[in-house]
From Swiss-Prot:
One example GO MF annotation: ATP binding
Record comment: activity regulation: Feedback inhibition by glutathione. Inhibited by buthionine sulfoximine and cystamine.
UniProt effect for mutating C406S: 20-fold decreased activity. Abrogates the response to changes in redox environment
UniProt name for this protein: Glutamate--cysteine ligase, chloroplastic
Top-level taxonomy: Eukaryota, Viridiplantae, Streptophyta, Embryophyta, Tracheophyta
Effect after changing C349S: 2-fold decreased activity
Purpose of the protein: Seems to play an important role in controlling the expression of resistance responses like the regulation of salicylic acid (SA) and phytoalexin (camalexin) production. Involved in resistance to fungal and bacterial pathogens. Required for the regulation of cell proliferation in root apical meristems through the GSH-dependent developmental pathway. Also participates in the detoxification process, the antioxidant response and is essential for embryo development and proper seed maturation.
Reaction catalysis annotation: L-cysteine + L-glutamate + ATP = gamma-L-glutamyl-L-cysteine + ADP + phosphate + H(+)
Enzyme type, top EC level: ligase
Effect recorded for S298N: In pad2-1; reduced GSH level. Camalexin defective. Enhanced susceptibility to P.porri
Gene Ontology BP annotations: defense response by callose deposition in cell wall; defense response to bacterium; defense response to fungus; defense response to insect; flower development; glucosinolate biosynthetic process; glutathione biosynthetic process; indole phytoalexin biosynthetic process
Organism of derivation: Arabidopsis thaliana (Mouse-ear cress)
Length: 522
């Protein structure tokens, strides 16, 4: 879901020309003005972590006290004053902010995030908040994580550059540290699952790796005590029919990857969007709703098609010749806001735009101007299939068992971090039309790899793509290609994980979804 995703680390203006294409060099190299924090990048490094980000590190702006391993912050995000510009922000500053994500290739990292459903083993019911609080406290005390509080409620944990956070329906999320290899990424996932299981088992709690809540109704799901979610819950039904399901009943796995320049960002963005439906098919794992088959292989993916058209989708403008950081900023400026954060409170700004905010004409905060923190927060409320912040997020996959949590980043690292594979993907998809990309996005949640495409099936494209991913990993030289074994059989047979679940449901499970809680238990 990535509702909380916040860019980590601080940011800096890149030297002229490092992250630019013709026509934007001046903007990129000179966009951010009068920001003392820009020198802090070396001090803090870079992180993909979602919970506290830069803001929690800038001590002048966060009132906090430490007692043992408890980190008290006013709320999440901790403060609206974290990054203070001495002059009003301009559109050029916002462009430069995105451009500041450019890194040299030796600094490329892999940031993996995944969500899972906690449930009572005896009843299969979703975890309640008091159980989640007990679990978070237990993990903090046993494994030395810092607690993140909103008021007097524990809402997450932090340890180094990793964080654990709660999605609106109590989905438990690990936002991993930015790591160099997939071996490190998979070890991090396994360590996290071990820690969670060690505490949860004693409480009679299990965790389920699936893309959509298979058994319980929306009204059975507990709501987490986080201020921003109240605003979103009130707004969602106004803009789509499935937004509340997205918030409360979905789980995803995603990977965050770096780019070296604006041109490199564009190439990776286009490749990621074109192939996102293939990732959706390979990891499709949400065929049940309220105890029965729902007609989809990825209900989670389908839900995004009727959540909020203003902030979701396949972003056809990314394929325009004119696309770059500037065009993404213009898109984001006109995506309606959810909230601003002032004086430890969330202010409802739904339906208003950041463009109005930039002009000091936000009806919910008349005369006020935005900070970088406001911009960071706004970028996290945009939910396309690939999202740009100071890195790119691949957002098309369902949550699943641990092997697939390692396979998803492996798939994208092999394709996007290897120049030959990336070029091959761009060549392969160069003549795909916007209508074809949209068709795949809409049909794959129903028909998976059996979706007809041109003269064959999507399965045949996936075979070529998986080979490119493996080749890309081999060329990296870290012996990482084995992480793709979890999706080998899916591509070879054309049978998605969801179709295997449906086969068991109609066979040995006797048309009950209850066995899925054991089948996909972490």
């Amino acid at each position: 879901m990535a509702l909380l995703s916040q860019a980590g680390g601080s940011y800096t203006v890149v030297p002229s020309g490092v992250c630019s294409k013709a026509g934007t060099k001046a903007v990129v190299s000179g966009g951010v003005r009068n920001l003392d924090v820009l020198r802090m990048k070396e001090a803090f490094g870079s992180s993909y972590s979602r919970s506290l980000s830069t803001k929690s590190m800038l001590l002048h702006s966060v009132k906090r006290s430490k007692r043992g391993h408890q980190l008290i912050v006013a709320a999440s995000p901790p403060t609206e004053e974290a990054v203070v510009a001495t002059e009003p922000l301009t559109r050029e500053d916002l462009i430069a902010y995105l451009a500041s994500g450019c890194k040299t290739k030796d600094k490329y990292r892999i940031g993996t995030e995944h969500e899972k459903f906690g449930f009572e083993v005896n009843t299969l019911r979703p975890m309640k908040y008091d159980q989640i609080a007990e679990l978070l406290n237990g993990i903090a005390e046993r494994f030395e994580w810092e607690k993140v509080m909103e008021g007097d409620k524990i809402i997450g944990l932090k340890q180094g550059k990793q964080s654990i956070s709660l999605e609106p329906g109590g989905q438990f999320e690990l936002s991993g540290a930015p790591l160099e290899t997939l071996h490190q990424t998979c070890a991090e996932v396994n360590s996290h699952l071990y820690q969670v299981k060690a505490v949860a088992e004693e409480m009679g709690i299990g965790f389920l790796g699936i893309g959509f809540q298979p058994k319980w109704r929306r009204e059975d799901i507990p709501i987490m005590p986080k201020g921003r979610y109240d605003i979103m819950r009130n707004y969602m039904p106004k803009v789509g029919t499935l937004g509340l399901d997205m918030m409360l009943r979905t789980c995803t796995v995603q990977v965050n990857l770096d780019f070296s320049s604006e041109a490199d960002m564009i190439r990776k963005f286009r490749a990621g969007l074109a192939l996102q439906p293939i990732a959706t098919a390979l990891f499709a794992n949400s065929p049940f709703t309220e105890g029965k088959p729902n007609g989809f292989l990825s209900m989670r993916s389908h839900i995004w098609t009727d959540t909020d058209k203003d902030r979701t989708g396949m972003l056809p403008f990314v394929f325009d010749d004119s696309f770059g950081f500037e065009q993404y900023v213009d898109y984001a400026l006109d995506v309606p806001m959810y909230f601003a954060y002032r004086k430890n409170k969330y202010i409802d700004c739904t339906g208003m735009t950041f463009r109005q905010f930039l002009a000091g004409k936000l009806p919910c905060l008349p005369g006020e101007l935005p900070s970088y923190n406001d911009w960071e927060n706004h970028l996290t409320t945009i939910f396309p299939e690939v999202r740009l912040k100071r890195y790119l997020e691949m957002r098309g996959a369902d949550g699943g068992p641990w092997r697939r949590l390692c396979a998803l980043p492996a798939f994208w690292v092999g394709l996007l971090y290897d120049d030959d594979s990336l070029q091959a993907i761009l060549d392969l998809t160069a003549d795909w039309t916007p209508a074809e990309r949209e068709m795949l996005r809409n049909k794959v949640p129903v028909t998976g790899l059996k979706t007809p495409f041109r003269d064959g099936l999507l399965k045949h494209v996936a075979e070529d793509v998986l080979k490119l991913a493996k080749d890309g990993l081999e060329r990296r030289g870290y012996k990482e290609a084995g992480f793709l074994n979890a999706v080998d059989e899916v591509v070879r047979t054309g049978v998605t994980p969801a179709e295997k679940l449906l086969e068991m449901y109609n066979g040995e499970w006797g048309q009950s979804v209850d066995p899925v809680f054991e089948e996909l238990l972490y």
